Amino acid sequence: MEYKEAIVESMRMLAQQERILFIGQSVRYSGHVMYNTLQDAEVPMEKRIELPVFEDTQMGMSIGLSLAGFLPVSIYPRMDFLIIAANQLVNHLDKMEEMSHGEFNPKMIIRTMVGGRIPLGPGPQHCQDHTSALGLLCPNINVRMLDSTDGVLPSYQEALESPKSSILVEYGDMY
């Protein structure tokens, strides 16, 4: 199985879960390879929430959906864009269980990508890898690098089953 096929199978597996919603940029309309994986996985449109470019608000909406009983897969096409949501990610999602003395524990799956440099580099602001930093900033969130095909489906399965939120980092050059 190729890397993209493993991603597609993972999206298909997630889409079968009743509580799952996919939220972000290019989830209903073409514009990024992550859209293609949702299409190839035949994720129903009613499970997709398209958003404009407002990353911090997207993270807040995803937290709200989680607190309302959904399991959002919040999609950030580039890791560089996820950094814009750091306020909600680091200060709210990661700390909410502690801040609420265990009353609230939102869970979501955050899907992001280190932009590919092949065949044409997108520029330094679209291909940075902040995986290690996110692990340090978010000690209560599982952060996984999807740097091998064999690890893709098990990592998404773990993210689904874990009581904690997860950040899954895909690599564009592996597509």
Predicted regions and their residues:
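Thiamine diphosphate
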Residues: 1-175
